[in-house]
Structure formats: structure tokens, C-alpha cells
From Swiss-Prot:
Its EC number is 1.8.4.12. The gene is msrB. Residues 9-136 form the MsrB domain. The lineage of its organism: Bacteria, Pseudomonadati, Pseudomonadota, Betaproteobacteria, Burkholderiales. This is Peptide methionine sulfoxide reductase MsrB. Belongs to the MsrB Met sulfoxide reductase family. GO terms for molecular function: peptide-methionine (R)-S-oxide reductase activity; zinc ion binding. It comes from Variovorax paradoxus (strain S110). InterPro entries: Met_Sox_Rdtase_MsrB (IPR028427), Met_Sox_Rdtase_MsrB_dom (IPR002579), Mss4-like_sf (IPR011057). Binds 1 zinc ion per subunit. The zinc ion is important for the structural integrity of the protein.
Length: 136
């Protein structure tokens, strides 16, 4: 997968450490790990602002599109900027899902499901470890 921003694992680790990212951020964003449900700092976070990629700072979601899906991960109904998120078919764990990655740096963000409660019908189910929040 080629993206505009390419770095080695060592460079990503250093960048995330410099940003003060939580310990799980490297494994989540660079190796598609998933944080445990109801443990992420943004799961029950309702401040007004924007959510960005922890790795490169790309704007991903507006807080106005966040909703409580009851799944244990921050959930959004649509991306903030069309094309900011790239979809990849994920066949891991014996199922087929749609993985979301940052279109700018390839960071694993989470998955999108067609069961959202809003007019988009989508539920972007994200890992808090892949996000950085900027308050309005």
C-alpha cells in the first residue's frame, strides 16, 4: 500500500512517542491491532471539535457526526473530508469486513459497518488510539 507519507516502524514509533500517543497507538495504527471495547479515551468523549489521525494529523471526523453505538469504540456517521479515509477489504478473523485506513499515511483506524442509525447508514467504528482530538 503506497500513501503520501511513508516511514519505517522506528520512525513511526519515534513520532508517536514525541506526540505523547498512548502506548497502543503504534500496534493499532501500524499493525492493525484493535483496542479492547470500552477502554479507549474517546469512546465516551463528547467535546465539540475534530478528530484527526494520530500519525499524520489528517482531519478525519467532526464531533457532530459522533454517536453512541453501544459497541465500545468511538463511532461516527461520516468522514469529515471526503477521501480522507480509504477502505480496504479485511478478511481476517474468519470474516469479511471493511477496514478504514488514513488515506494520507495508511494508519489503521478501525472498520466501517452498514448499520449506522443516521441517514448515511454507516457506523465508522474507530480505535481511540488512532485518533487525536482538537477541541473547538
Amino acid at each position: 500500500m503506497t500513501t503520501p507519507i511513508e516511514k519505517t516502524d522506528a520512525e513511526w514509533k519515534a513520532l508517536l512517542a514525541e506526540k505523547g500517543a498512548e502506548p497502543a497507538a503504534f500496534e493499532v495504527t501500524r499493525h492493525a491491532a484493535t483496542e479492547r471495547p470500552f477502554t479507549g479515551k474517546y469512546e465516551a468523549h463528547w467535546d465539540d471539535g475534530t478528530y484527526h489521525c494520530i500519525c499524520c494529523g489528517a482531519k478525519l471526523f467532526e464531533s457532530s457526526t459522533k454517536f453512541d453505538a453501544g459497541c465500545g469504540w468511538p463511532s461516527f456517521s461520516q468522514e469529515a473530508v471526503p477521501g480522507a479515509i480509504r477502505n480496504i477489504v479485511d478478511r481476517s478473523h474468519g470474516m469479511v469486513r471493511t477496514e478504514n485506513v488514513c488515506a494520507n499515511c495508511g494508519a489503521h483506524l478501525g472498520h466501517v459497518f452498514p448499520d449506522g442509525p443516521t441517514e448515511t447508514g454507516l457506523r465508522y467504528c474507530m480505535n481511540s488510539a488512532s485518533l487525536d482530538f482538537k477541541k473547538k
